[in-house]
């Protein structure tokens, strides 16, 4: 195996709240369960089944793109849950905007990061960019 070998990493995307004085920060980690040599195609894919746990926030970007921010609670063993921020685009944005808290959803997307400015500082947000979403009854 060379230094530039493509690898597939699979596992769980987890969240932890970290206290910083009076504030909480949501830290996101990949809990790796396995690593194998990958094929040729680049792929950044995450599949989630969870619940909408915060009121969806719908808006339009300055370029007119429809987006909805959601927070998905994904249950795991031992009565623990991970809270994963996600962003829905276009028709998924319209669907997500109408979903009440507690709705069970299945999503497929990718993990992404983006830079934003808050106050005087530049920050990085990590989120799941949802390509497909369906409500599970």
Task: Report residues per predicted region.
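Single-stranded nucleic acid-binding surfaces, predominantly the OB-fold ssDNA-binding core
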Residues: 1-137
